[in-house]
């Protein structure tokens, strides 16, 4: 029966052609022809397969386990192919599905199509078919059913499925196992054979994410490489873990590639497959393909990328324009160049072989990356100009290649005429007109002529000048590619004619005209033109001189006096000095004054040493200082000097100010006669005595002090009459005039009767405590005894006297505005006197003064409110007093050493910067400075309190000695005091006294009242110190104005007759000075106002 089936099959196949076709499509046949068969343990069995082509078997065991399985082919007369499978000794391992199939139908992707039979081999000791270890891992897709393959060797054996929770209900098929939907975890199959229980090892169910479609992405970091570089390609699968991926690439056969897998689970599942090909060569060029297949389903996806490998880098330049380009003037145009290059190139532009300097608004370049190896560079002309013409070159270069492309750019410019001139041919009367024009393209030149000058405004009067006209020659030639010159020559011009040059090109035209004048008229025009030019030059010169004259700084008195203040405190009325009365008692006869050498000279005036005869009864001959203006002084400066005189008469006398002695205001230049101060200004005195001070204070070593700006070693060779240093100009240059300019001064012999000078020795250390001192020691502070040199107590004495002098000015509502050591003089007896020395100081060349508009300001001495808000008060003078203290205790140093007056200086002052303690100041003195430098003016001490503070630092007897000297001064017949009295009726400033003693007592009592009212605290906005104002008339700066009538030149001396009248007295006075050991030459060299 087993052999009849093939015979019938063959016979059926031969019946008709249709049957034959069906036969080709039919499956092979298996004998026995059953779906399943049970075979006894250890018995043998055989299976035969018949087919029309070659057939093969597929069975449960692997080739390693199939030693007792034999397969052979048999011949068959019917033409069929027969394959026999024989098992000699059946065991439980032989249980499974046996399949016969055609060889040509075997593929890797699909299941075999053939005939099947399932064989059972029951074994009482083996309930379940043996499995490989991988079979115990059950992979389940999301929520899909799965099979746990616990197959039995006997189809009749009952089986149950268990997990950690117990029996799991599921359908069971002895050929497959349990089929169902299982959660993740271990499962065990349990069977009972003849009362004996069998269990499998655990089946582990594992769930993998899988989708019905594959999301595959392929990426290559680069698609172009050079030999030797590493190719890297990646493929990524998203949201699927059951994937099989295969690479296909040129180097696959050689196994050159290295593959890696990376699983990324955050934020979603991603499998990244990386292919790396090191040391790439040209042969590695080609398609790189990755194919992904889902392991549990028939889902496939494929991606590919083309990689090219070059032997070395390359550059290709493809411009989108020609080598000659034109652009219209003011046109916007872009020039684009395409570049292919690897490695990435550096792209630059050149103009005329020079690196192109981009103008932010007119020409720019940029580079844009289009693709991996494609770039686009643009040259942008925003508004083309004529100078943009030239040769432009783009250069692209990398490590392996350099390529460039050059094109010429022409900016097309409308025609313009550069020049139109006529050349004369002398007496022959011939004239040539030259017309130079430029433009791109090169313009054509056309000549036109108008013979009737009066009608040349009408275009019809102009005719084109032909080339071949008798006595007229035209020619044209080009200078370069954009400039052309045309000429027309007239053999003779007998009358005035007009000639027009017309230059034109494609972009525009321009014309220009000139007149040709006959030679007879030309000479007349030349003379008229010369006169006109000369007149213009004269007018311009006058304007320049007027401007220079107006910009020249003018002399202005610094002192100001308040007349009244508004109730709200915001408006101030100042005393107009010109409105003050001038008491004729101050007038001094000119013939009683003999002028000597110049002590100080400035931009506006000078101070001259003089001898006055008859100023006081006790001193018929007195050495004085005379202020005067220069002969070139303007009326406003004469008015300012007169204002200064009236203010001095208004203030009255004080020991610590330079007192007025008299004045000459009539029949000549204005002279102001003041006290003569023997030792000169305080700065010079401190410099001169610095070595003696340092010798008395060994803890203050002699070192080079930067604040002085000089070398102490050179002091022996320096003249102290010069107040400015040549190197830095810190102090005024007191230029000495020629000694023959004035009659030499005759000195007096007697000492001052109002300065009671006692000499005694004293010496105090730099750091000291207040102690009681002998009267003689105290008096030494107010004496001319220099045997002990300059001491610290001398510095404190100077400090105290300046405070008393400023206290007096404050009591008179007078603001100084220029308090500094250069404006403090030292008289005999070491008496300090405050003055305003601006007239005789060359402030325009003095570094201490900074130009602000038409004035100069001592910025380093000024308070912040004066610098920034133009506010001047007694409290701003307190700030300057603190700077003066710094000068004194640094022995004449310049404030803020090493700092220039600039924006940095102003910012530091605003931010609260203050100078450090000078080397020779005690902590108590420095504390005074700091109080004076408070940024809030109202928190600064008054001069009254400053006097008391400094007084406490001096010996106890000092004040008594000082007050005695001051009182003696007020009782004396000193001219400054005497002229305040009226001899006829013993009245003093409008108050009548019965006798001299009552007057003096009232004066002494008034001193304390005067001190208590010293701190006025007024805030005085003075408009003439605005940092940047234009120069204004003096009358605009005050509430009232007046004009002085004193305008005259300075006389250079007094009459000889006057000198002869005083000769006897003068000789006697000189003898007296010799007796006290005063050298008259020293007085001239070391003294000034």
UniProtKB/Swiss-Prot annotation:
The active site is at 818 (proton acceptor). CDD domains: Ig4_PDGFR, IgI_PDGFR-alphabeta, PTKc_PDGFR_alpha. Changing residue 574 to F: Abolishes interaction with SRC-family members and impairs internalization of the activated receptor. Its EC number is 2.7.10.1. Residues 1041-1059 have a biased composition (Polar residues). It catalyses: L-tyrosyl-[protein] + ATP = O-phospho-L-tyrosyl-[protein] + ADP + H(+). N-glycosylated. Ubiquitinated, leading to its internalization and degradation. It is linked to A chromosomal aberration involving PDGFRA is found in some cases of hypereosinophilic syndrome. Interstitial chromosomal deletion del(4)(q12q12) causes the fusion of FIP1L1 and PDGFRA (FIP1L1-PDGFRA). Mutations that cause overexpression and/or constitutive activation of PDGFRA may be a cause of hypereosinophilic syndrome. ATP binds at residues 599-607, 627. Changing residue 846 to Y: In GISTPS; uncertain significance. Changing residue 561 to D: In a GIST sample; constitutively activated kinase. This is Platelet-derived growth factor receptor alpha. Glycans are attached at residues 42, 76, 103, 179, 353, 359, 458, 468. The record marks 578-579 as: Breakpoint for interstitial deletion to form the FIP1L1-PDGFRA fusion protein. One of its GO terms (cellular component) is receptor complex. SMART domains: IG, IGc2, S_TKc, TyrKc. Residues 24-113, 117-201, 202-306, 319-410, 414-517 form the Ig-like C2-type domain.
């Amino acid at each position: 029966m087993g052999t009849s089936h093939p015979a019938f099959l063959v016979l059926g196949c031969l019946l008709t052609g249709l049957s034959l076709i069906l036969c080709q499509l039919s499956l092979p046949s298996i004998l026995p022809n059953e779906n399943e068969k049970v075979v006894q343990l250890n018995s043998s069995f055989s299976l035969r397969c018949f087919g029309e082509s070659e057939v093969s078997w597929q069975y449960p065991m692997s080739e390693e386990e199939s030693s007792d399985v034999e397969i052979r082919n048999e011949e068959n007369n019917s033409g069929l192919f027969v394959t026999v499978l024989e098992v000699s000794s059946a065991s439980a391992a032989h249980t499974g599905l046996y399949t016969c199939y055609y060889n040509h139908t075997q593929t890797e992707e699909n299941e075999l199509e053939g005939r099947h039979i399932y064989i059972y081999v029951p074994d009482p000791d083996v309930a379940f078919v043996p499995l490989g270890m991988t079979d115990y891992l059950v992979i389940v897709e999301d929520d899909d059913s799965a099979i746990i393959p616990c197959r039995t060797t006997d189809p009749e054996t009952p089986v149950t499925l268990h997990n950690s929770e117990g029996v799991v209900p599921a359908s069971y098929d002895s050929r497959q196992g349990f089929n169902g939907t299982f959660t993740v975890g271990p499962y065990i199959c349990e069977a009972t054979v003849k009362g004996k229980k069998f269990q499998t090892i655990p089946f582990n169910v594992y769930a993998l994410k899988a989708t019905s479609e594959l999301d595959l992405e392929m990426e290559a970091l680069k698609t172009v490489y050079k030999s030797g570089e590493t190719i890297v390609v990646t493929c990524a699968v998203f949201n699927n873990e059951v994937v099989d991926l295969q690479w296909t690439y040129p180097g696959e056969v050689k196994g050159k590639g290295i593959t890696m897998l990376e699983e990324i689970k955050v934020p979603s599942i991603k499998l990244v497959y990386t292919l790396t090909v090191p040391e790439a060569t040209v042969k590695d060029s080609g398609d790189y393909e990755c194919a992904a297949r889902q392991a549990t389903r028939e889902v496939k996806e494929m991606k590919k990328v083309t990689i090219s490998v070059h032997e070395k880098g390359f550059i290709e330049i493809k411009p989108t324009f020609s080598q000659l380009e034109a652009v219209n003037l003011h046109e916007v145009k872009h020039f684009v160049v395409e570049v292919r290059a690897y490695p990435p190139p550096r792209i630059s532009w050149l103009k005329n072989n020079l690196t192109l300097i981009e103008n932010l608004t007119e020409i720019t370049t940029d580079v844009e990356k289009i693709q991996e190896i494609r770039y686009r560079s643009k040259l942008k002309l925003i508004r083309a100009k004529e100078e943009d013409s030239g040769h432009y070159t783009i250069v692209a270069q990398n490590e392996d290649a350099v390529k460039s492309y050059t094109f010429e750019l022409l900016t097309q410019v409308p025609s313009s005429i550069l020049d139109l001139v006529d050349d004369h041919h002398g007496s022959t009367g011939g004239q040539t007109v030259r017309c130079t024009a430029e433009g791109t393209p090169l313009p054509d030149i056309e000549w036109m002529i108008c013979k009737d000058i009066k009608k040349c405004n009408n275009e019809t009067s102009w005719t084109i000048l032909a080339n071949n006209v008798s006595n007229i020659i035209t020619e044209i030639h080009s200078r370069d590619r954009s400039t052309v010159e045309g000429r027309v020559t007239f053999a003779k011009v007998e009358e005035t004619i007009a000639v027009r040059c017309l230059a034109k090109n494609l972009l525009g035209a321009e014309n220009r005209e000139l007149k040709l004048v006959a030679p007879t008229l030309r000479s007349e025009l030349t003379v008229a033109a010369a006169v006109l030019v000369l007149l213009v030059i004269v007018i311009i010169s006058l304007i320049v001189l007027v401007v220079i004259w107006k910009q020249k700084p003018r002399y202005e008195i610094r002192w100001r006096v308040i007349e009244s203040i508004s109730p709200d405190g915001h408006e101030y009325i100042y005393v107009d000095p010109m409105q003050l009365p001038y008491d004729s008692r101050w007038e001094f006869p000119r013939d009683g004054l003999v002028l000597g050498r110049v002590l100080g000279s400035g931009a506006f005036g000078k101070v001259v040493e003089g001898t006055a005869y008859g100023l006081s009864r006790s001193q018929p001959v007195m050495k004085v200082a005379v202020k005067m203006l220069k002969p070139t002084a303007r009326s406003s400066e004469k008015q300012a000097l007169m204002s200064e005189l009236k203010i001095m008469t208004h203030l009255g006398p004080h020991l610590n100010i330079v007192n007025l002695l008299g004045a000459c205001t009539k029949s000549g230049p204005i002279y102001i006669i003041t006290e003569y101060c023997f030792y000169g200004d305080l700065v010079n005195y401190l410099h001169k005595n610095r070595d003696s001070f340092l010798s008395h204070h060994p803890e203050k070593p002699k070192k080079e002090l930067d604040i002085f700006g000089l070398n102490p070693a050179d002091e022996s060779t320096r003249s102290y009459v010069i107040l400015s240093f040549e190197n830095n100009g810190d102090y005024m240059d007191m230029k000495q005039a020629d000694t023959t300019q004035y009659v030499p001064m005759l000195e007096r012999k007697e000492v001052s009767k109002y300065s009671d000078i006692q000499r005694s020795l004293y010496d105090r250390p730099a750091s000291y405590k207040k102690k009681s001192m002998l009267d003689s020691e105290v008096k030494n502070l107010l004496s001319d005894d220099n045997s002990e040199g300059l001491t610290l107590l001398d510095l404190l004495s100077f400090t105290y006297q300046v405070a008393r002098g400023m206290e007096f000015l404050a009591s008179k509502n007078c603001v100084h505005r220029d308090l500094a050591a250069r404006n403090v003089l030292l008289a005999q007896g070491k008496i300090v006197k405050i003055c305003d020395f601006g007239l005789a100081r060359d402030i325009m060349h003095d570094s201490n003064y900074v130009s602000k508009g038409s004035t100069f300001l001592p910025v380093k001495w000024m308070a912040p409110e004066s610098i920034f808000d133009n506010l001047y008060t007694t409290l701003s003078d307190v700030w300057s007093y603190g700077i003066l203290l710094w000068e004194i205790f640094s022995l004449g140093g310049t404030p803020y050493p090493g700092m220039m007056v600039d924006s940095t200086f102003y910012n530091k002052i605003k931010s609260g910067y203050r100078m450090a303690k000078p080397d020779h100041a005690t902590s108590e003195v420095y504390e005074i400075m700091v109080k004076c430098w408070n940024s809030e003016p109202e928190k600064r001490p008054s001069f009254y309190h400053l006097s008391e503070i400094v007084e406490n630092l001096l010996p106890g007897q000092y004040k008594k000695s000082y007050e005695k000297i001051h009182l003696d001064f007020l009782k004396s017949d000193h001219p400054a005091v005497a002229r305040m009295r009226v001899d006829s009726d013993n009245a003093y400033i409008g108050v009548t006294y019965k006798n001299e003693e009552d007057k003096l007592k009232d004066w002494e009592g008034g001193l304390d009242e005067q001190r208590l009212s010293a701190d006025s605290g007024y805030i005085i906005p003075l408009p003439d110190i605005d940092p940047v104002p234009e120069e204004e008339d003096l009358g605009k700066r005050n509430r009232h104005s007046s004009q002085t009538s004193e305008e005259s030149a300075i006389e250079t001396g007094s009459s000889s007759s006057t000198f002869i009248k005083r000769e006897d007295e003068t000789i006697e006075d000189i003898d007296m000075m010799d007796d006290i050991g005063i050298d008259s030459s020293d007085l001239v060299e070391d003294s000034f106002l």
